[in-house]
C-alpha cells in the first residue's frame, strides 16, 4: 500500500476511518462475490441510502504476507473505492500507524 491509496489493476482504494465496510463500485475488484439479498443500504453523508448489489472479498499480497478484505460491499453508485480501517485491522489482526506523508500497517 502507498501513503494515500493502493492500486489493484487500474482502481485506487482509499483508507477511510468513517466507513464500517469496504466499498467498491467495480465487481471486478472482488475475487469471490454473491448477490446481496438483504434490504440494508449504505448511508452516505447526505443521508441518502445507496443500494448494495453484491457482497464479496479479495486478498492483497504484500512483502510480508497477504491481507484479506472480507464483506466488501459492491455499490454501483459510489465513485471511490474505500477501505474501512476498522474492518481491515480486525480482519487482519493489524493496526495502522498514520504519519504526515504515509501510513504503516503493523501486526
Residue ranges and their predicted role:
Residues 1-107:
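Anionic group-binding determinants
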Amino acid at each position: 500500500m502507498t501513503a494515500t491509496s493502493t492500486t489493484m489493476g487500474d482502481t485506487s482504494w482509499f483508507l477511510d476511518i468513517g466507513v464500517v465496510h469496504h466499498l467498491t463500485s467495480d465487481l471486478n475488484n472482488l475475487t469471490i462475490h454473491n448477490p446481496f439479498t438483504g434490504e440494508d443500504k449504505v448511508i452516505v453523508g447526505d443521508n441518502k441510502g445507496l443500494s448494495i448489489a453484491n457482497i464479496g472479498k479479495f486478498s492483497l499480497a504484500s512483502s510480508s504476507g497477504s491481507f484479506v478484505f472480507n464483506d466488501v460491499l459492491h455499490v454501483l453508485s459510489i465513485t471511490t473505492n474505500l477501505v474501512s480501517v476498522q474492518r481491515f485491522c480486525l480482519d487482519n489482526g493489524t493496526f495502522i500507524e498514520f504519519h504526515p506523508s504515509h501510513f504503516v500497517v503493523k501486526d
